[in-house]
Amino acid sequence: RKETYKSNDPINDRKSIDLRPAIVEQRSRIGDYEVDLVMGANHKGAILTFNDRATGYTLLGHLPCKGAIHTKEMIAKLITENQLTIHTITSDNGKEFSKHKELSEEFNLDYYFAHPYHSWERGSNENYNRLLRQYFPKGADLRFISEEELERVQNKLNNRPRKRFGYMSPKQVYLQAIKNQGNVNLLNNNQQNKKLPL
């Protein structure tokens, strides 16, 4: 499906990150996600990254093009197929996220938008995208990635030990949080919510 936009098209019913609950910033529960697109050469093809803020556990989806319908459908697919608990999603203001209201209604979640040019407000995504670029460098053609290749990279990064978790992997932290009813506080007490690099 081809999608077109006028350059001045607004994203309707946008909810600012300023209204996001404080608990999201605390990273004390699973289910608060950041979403972004890592673009391929000439903006043809993209990888959607869907990152749990508290644990760093991330799911990847391949988009041959970055239209809003394709983006919304991929997010819905990741949520449904992985049976995710979702409280909030935060993204930038790209037109590809203009179907946010449909996601909010379908999954009973709150969707927030960061301020323009404030990439640090989505720090989990930004840090993860830098790791992803080790496998898919800037300028790479992302139109024809296989599901097997994407899953291989997803598993590698989810199983890579991270400093912020005392060198546990995002997958380990995520699975422990599920056993702890979604609560991540017990895992992060020794970190005192310090903003350490991935």
For the regions a protein language model found, what residue spans apply to each?
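Short, surface-exposed connector motifs at secondary-structure boundaries
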Residues: T55-L59, E81-H87, Y135-F136
